[in-house]
């Protein structure tokens, strides 16, 4: 029994680099961020789920097609996307939640903005590949 407990604890203590599923998911999110900073339809299509629901911090909600269009036609451009915190959890097989906060600089329809954003994202394993399924975010006001 003691050996089983020690084995279980050693698996739970593995860093991300030694946890293959967490490493795959981190790589998928890194690819998503890279695609948002230098967008092409192909890069975005590869990482976004067909059923994407993307709720921006201003309340606007996009589908996959709407998000890809706004990023590739220049309506929205991101120049900074820097995580302060990014945590993954696996509540069910094939589902991952990602929570945290990041600093962003963007220009949306000609209006420049710089903010700190809090978020909850959902990733789903689709045909063996992690796909970005949902995003909900809110602006975090500066400390007073």
Model-derived features: where do they sit?
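Positively charged n-region of N-terminal signal peptides that target proteins for export
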Residues: 1-4
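Hydrophobic h-region of N-terminal signal peptides that target proteins for export
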Residues: 9-17
């Amino acid at each position: 029994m003691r050996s089983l407990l020690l084995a279980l604890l050693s698996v739970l203590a593995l860093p991300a680099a030694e946890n293959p599923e967490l490493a795959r998911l981190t790589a998928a999110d890194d690819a998503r961020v890279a695609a948002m900073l230098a967008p092409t339809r192909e890069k975005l299509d590869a990482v976004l789920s067909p059923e994407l629901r993307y709720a921006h911090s201003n309340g606007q909600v996009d589908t996959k097609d709407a998000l890809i269009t706004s990023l590739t036609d220049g309506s929205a451009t991101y120049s900074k996307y820097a995580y302060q915190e990014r945590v993954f959890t696996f509540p069910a097989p094939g589902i991952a939640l990602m929570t945290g906060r990041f600093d962003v600089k963007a220009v949306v329809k000609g209006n420049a903005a710089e903010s700190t954003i809090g978020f909850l994202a959902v990733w789903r394993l689709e045909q063996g590949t992690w796909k970005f399924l949902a995003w909900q975010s809110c602006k975090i006001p500066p400390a007073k």
